[in-house]
């Protein structure tokens, strides 16, 4: 089992003291946590240096929470908003196509599925909320990788060789880069048997209020229901669904 770092625990204990007090002095922190004054001083200096605490001048000097904590809380709240809103929108998209609809986010070199609404057909895609797949093998993953800037994409590709889930998976980094350029230009991605030879999938990006691609929505179905009309029909549907979800997250096309 990994070792717990006492200094980190103490720093978190300090931050949690501010849950019921807007400002605290070093003496109050010391008394509440029963820690040595030198330890508290070092932790407070470190938290101030990183912006997690702000110094309030006076006698005595006091401290209050800094902006990074608000940003972390906002990021967490934003993820909750994404899931809540996505559940509603994916149900509407699934009702329109009667195929599996997913919303996923990028986590390192993988995608993680946050929301899924299944089709009513007896033959359907095998997936689940929380499932992880190599991003480059999926339509949602390609959308999310294409949204990264060059350094971020380089970092993902540097994690190791590109895994092959099927013979159709893209395993060459330069070929993937070229493919992502096309995805970026078109705003839509496809998985043509790259994660499962029996499945087809199309995806589009979901943007937040700042215009950042924070998730991707997809429509997936087995090849037995794939027709020449499917790509165009599903692409239009997933674009519309992703745009609807983006709007619910505060994105406005007229402002970008």
Language-model segments: which ranges?
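Extended hydrophobic
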Residues: 172-242
């Amino acid at each position: 089992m990994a070792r717990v770092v006492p200094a980190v625990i103490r720093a978190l204990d300090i931050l949690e003291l501010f849950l019921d007090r807007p400002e605290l002095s070093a003496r109050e922190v010391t008394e509440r946590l029963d820690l040595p004054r030198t330890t508290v001083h070092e932790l407070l200096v470190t938290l101030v240096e990183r912006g997690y605490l702000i110094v309030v001048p006076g006698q005595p000097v006091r401290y209050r929470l800094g902006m990074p904590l608000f940003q972390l809380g906002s990021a967490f709240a934003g993820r909750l908003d994404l899931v809540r809103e996505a559940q509603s929108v994916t149900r509407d998209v699934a009702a329109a196509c009667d195929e599996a609809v997913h919303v996923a986010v990028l986590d390192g070199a993988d995608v993680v599925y946050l929301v899924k609404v299944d089709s009513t057909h007896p033959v359907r895609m095998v997936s689940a909320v929380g499932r992880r797949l190599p991003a480059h093998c999926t339509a949602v993953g390609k959308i999310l990788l294409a949204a990264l800037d060059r350094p971020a994409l380089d970092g993902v590709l540097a994690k190791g060789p590109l895994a092959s889930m099927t013979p159709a998976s893209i395993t060459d980094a330069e070929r993937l880069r070229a493919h992502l350029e096309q995805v970026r230009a078109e705003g839509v991605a496809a998985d043509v048997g790259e994660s499962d030879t029996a499945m087809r999938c199309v995806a589009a990006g979901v943007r937040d209020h700042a215009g950042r691609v924070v998730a991707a929505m997809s429509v997936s179905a087995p090849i037995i229901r794939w027709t020449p009309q499917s790509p165009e029909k599903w692409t239009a549907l997933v674009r519309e669904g992703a745009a609807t979800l983006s709007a619910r997250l505060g994105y406005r096309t007229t402002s970008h």
